């Protein structure tokens, strides 16, 4: 069963920026950003070595990890060149001006 949590206000999400939002009761932050025109939420840590993904870059629909340059496609979660690594995407719901995420 998913845990639905309020992550931020929609106005807090800036196109082209990576922002990690702390979530009460969860040990890692959640990144909410735009991939094309779609609002996307993913864990704030790299599945490779638990490095903060918000320290990386958002480039051409991918998050580039600052530690090793691993690139994660925001549409699929796949890591280029490392099929064993997958960045989970969380379902996003907009309620009024708030962004809610279903943590799986």
Name each region found by the language model.
Residues 1-60, 89-104:
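N-terminal pre-ligand scaffold of iron-sulfur
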Residues 46, 65-68:
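Short cysteine clusters
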Residues 52-58, 71-81:
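Iron-sulfur (Fe-S) cluster-binding segments and ferredoxin-like electron-carrier domains
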Residues 60-66, 80-88:
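Short cysteine/histidine-rich metal-coordination sites, predominantly Zn2+-binding motifs
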Residues 67-69, 79-81, 100-103:
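Low-complexity, flexible helical/coil segments
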């Amino acid at each position: 069963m998913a845990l639905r949590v309020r992550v931020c206000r929609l106005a807090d999400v800036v196109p082209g920026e990576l922002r990690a939002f702390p979530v009460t009761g969860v040990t890692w932050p959640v990144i909410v950003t735009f991939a094309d025109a779609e609002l996307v939420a993913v864990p704030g840590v790299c599945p490779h070595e638990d490095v903060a993904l918000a320290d990386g870059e958002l480039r051409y629909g991918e998050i580039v990890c600052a530690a090793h340059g691993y690139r994660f496609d925001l549409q699929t979660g796949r890591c280029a060149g490392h099929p064993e690594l997958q960045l989970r995407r969380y379902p996003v719901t907009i309620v009024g001006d708030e962004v809610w995420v279903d943590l799986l």
